[in-house]
Amino acid sequence: MIEFRNVTKTYDTGTKAVKNANFLIEKGEFCFLVGTSGSGKSTLIKLILKEEEPTSGNIIINGKDTTFLKPNRVPYLRRSMGVVFQDFRLLPDKTVYDNVAYAMYIVRATQRHIRRQVPMVLSLVGLSQKAKMYPHELSGGEQQRVALARALVNNPSMLIAD
């Protein structure tokens, strides 16, 4: 599902965020990546999402080498992933419902499917009663659950949390 083959990421400053990473995460596996602050955990996620390019090595996602993936194909790669970012990346001027629905709008889901799916995932994360609230009205834990609901709403093949 996710494979790194001799992946190195060196930033323009000369900082090596990732050095010769080799690993394979197969379908159905649950993987934790732990390390100190600045050890490259977020960089690995950015590499998986193609927000960053490796300096060397190959990254294989769902059996496809992303090394030569054209920029216009990156959104399709990302659709197979649900991502909860460290900073949640919620839209401050949108309700909880709309923050979750936004992930479905992007993939052009029908309004009918959105109306059915969003309440279901909000219930799953215990936020049904908060659907009309805005991010600033929620606790940090509730904001995190909105981000989780948004990551799950399109039934991704993998869930990545930073």
Q: Can you say where each PLM-predicted feature lies in the sequence?
A:
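Conserved ABC ATPase signature
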Residues: 134-138, 142
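Conserved ABC transporter NBD signature motif
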Residues: 57-65
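Helix-to-loop junction immediately C-terminal to a conserved catalytic motif
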Residues: 49
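Hydrophobic anchor residue at the start of the ABC signature
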Residues: 148
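A short, proline-enriched helix->beta-strand linker immediately N-terminal to the Walker B motif
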Residues: 153-157
